[in-house]
Amino acid sequence: RDDLVTGVQTCALPIYPEIEEIDVVEPDEELVEVCMKYFPDTARGLNDERVHIYHQDGLRFLRGRKGEYDIIINDSTDPFGHTEGLFTKEFYGICYQALKEDGIMVYQHGSPFFDEDESAFRSMHRKVYRSFPISRVYQAHVPTCASGYWMFGFASKKYHPLNDFDSKRWEERHLKTWYYTTNLHLGAFMLPKYVEDLLEQEEKENG
């Protein structure tokens, strides 16, 4: 299995023995050094021998790659400024091309809680929905993020996060996790009505 991460959040990946390669793309070399020094728990995965760090722009790194990755994890910052390119339809299309036939992309989706963030939230879903045959949004409580209520996106060429979910297969692996459970997996995709309405409106207008 080959994984690509934009950002430095790799701490959970090494527990999966089937992962062969992890490419981490982070243009800011100093940021990586600071994370490893002051946030060792968050950055501990960077020391895994399967991890390869590339200090360059994620869009430029992926452009031209075809069918190389099983999963792409986009842990970018907010959709403006120097990272704005990682929230464009072009970028999501490039991710689609870089994934294998059954590839998955997960990414931070912001929050619809505040009115000023709603337009970015809708725009992101619209672009991914147009780029992937399967596109779902899930939620988590992240106290360090604005409002504490944060959304993430799941996009795939083949697998649906609920219809293809096999809880028995997960339990049989006996992996020790700090946060994830099969019940949490199912619950994360159960969204509040106002969020469902926002997503459905974008899908109807762009279906």
Q: What would you call each of these model-derived segments?
A:
Residues A12-D102, D115-F121:
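The AdoMet/dcAdoMet-binding core of the Class I SAM-like
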Residues Y92-G93, E118-Q139, G153:
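Conserved Class I S-adenosyl-L-methionine
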Residues D102-H109:
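Conserved beta-strand signature within the Rossmann-like core of class I S-adenosyl-L-methionine
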Residues W150-G207:
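SAM/dcSAM-binding transferase cores
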Residues A146-G148:
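Short acidic/glycine-enriched loop/turn segments that link adjacent beta-strands
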Residues R1-C11:
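Single conserved hydrophobic/aromatic residue that forms the stacking wall/gate
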Residues D78-P79, G110-F114, V142-T144:
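Short "lid" loop at the C-terminus of a central beta-strand within the Rossmann-like core
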